[in-house]
Amino acid sequence: MRTATPQETFDHLMGAGALQYGWWVEYKPTGVDADGTVTGDWTAELTCETGDDDPASKTAVISHQVIMAAARSVMAELPQYASETMQGECAHLVFDADAADFDAGTSDELLQFMVLGEIVFG
């Protein structure tokens, strides 16, 4: 068993292309250099449209710890509209980091779950 490192969670969730989707309004990372190398305890303030008028968007601060907690939650109970592929990738983060391979879609699902509390866009 090898759990994902902070660098790996950053790479899989922030670097997989999900933030290119139009509903991601703002991304403010800290603890990461210009090359994407984690330099300490990283965080990312993310703002996502909600799909509703009020409020039109939500903001949350994501970190390695938040991602790992969300991965465990998804493993325990698959959120509505979440793919089984995303659930499997969450299991890899927790138990077999070398096998983790998030793409834009699966990382977007987990990011929406963490920021919005549900998966709205897909």
Region annotations inferred by a language model:
Residues M1-S57:
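Long, contiguous N-terminal structural blocks used for assembly/anchoring
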Residues H64-A82:
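Long, low-complexity intrinsically disordered regions enriched in Ser/Thr/Pro/Gly
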Residues E89-A91:
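Long acidic/polar interaction regions in large eukaryotic complex-forming proteins
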